[in-house]
Amino acid sequence: MNTTTLGTIGERLVEAELLKLGFCVARPSVDIDGYDLLAGTDAREYHRLQIKTCRIPVEHKGSYGYRYTAIKNRKSDFFIFVCLMHNAFYIVPTDQIAASIRLSGDGSGQSEIEKFFGAWHILKPTSTDHASAQVLDAQ
């Protein structure tokens, strides 16, 4: 599977999960450098989401985990890491991301990022930290 297909699968899984949770979701019609989706609970205010997808965990020093590297772009409000084999999501504020991370896929790992396992709630309005600027309708 090529990286474009893998990335598209991750984006669609995140989009479906957000819709199930009641979020408004918008997808840019062209590739935007810095984010893949816009999502929010109000149709007029969105978070910019960068989606990163890993297909299977890899072994490193006797343990297995999903490895994400070369994380350079910081134009989004949140990164969502998709662990395909575990069907798991980590919703992480961009300012909490290092250049590379390892995730267990089930929230049990040692990384500080593990606390963001399944943390969809941080995208809701009660979580005012990391809120993006308002995106207004074109009407």
Predicted regions and their residues:
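Mixed-charge (Asp/Glu-Lys/Arg
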Residues: 1-33, 38-139
